Amino acid sequence: WTAVVVSAAAGAPVIGAIAVAIAVGIHLWSCDTPEAEIRLLLVAATMGLAWESALVLAGLLEYSSGIWIPGLAPFWIVAMWILFATTLNVGMRWLRRSTAIAAVAGGIGGPLAFFAGASIGAVELVSPVIALISIGIGWAVMLPLLVRLAIRLDDSHRLVEQSA
């Protein structure tokens, strides 16, 4: 996270994207079922691109670096969604305990991450209060969805092995 946000704030978002590519490569190499994990990462990337672009188009966020197509979220924020998704079946596995826990974690953690990113210049919160509330609501909905998908994909290989 730090490498991506700091490099984006410094106007060199490619550095963070390279760090994400290396981390994701190592993660996939260590996975029992990389195919299922890739599906999770692709869904997270798509979800992230759509959500972050909606925030940009709504005028709530402005990014100064990494814009590939005007009106869309920068590539580095999509890379962060992919990086975050790599934690769902590992370090963030505790979110599986309940949908409410995942919703609260997303509702608090999402805005905090954006506040931190804005404080170092990676993103501008155009209307800070409205932006942070919107981000909190979005993450409170999306994190439980990502957790459920992670569970489904993580457990799918076990079902195949048991039926064989």
How would you label these PLM feature ranges?
Residues 1-164:
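Aromatic-rich, lipid-facing transmembrane alpha helices and their immediate juxtamembrane interface loops
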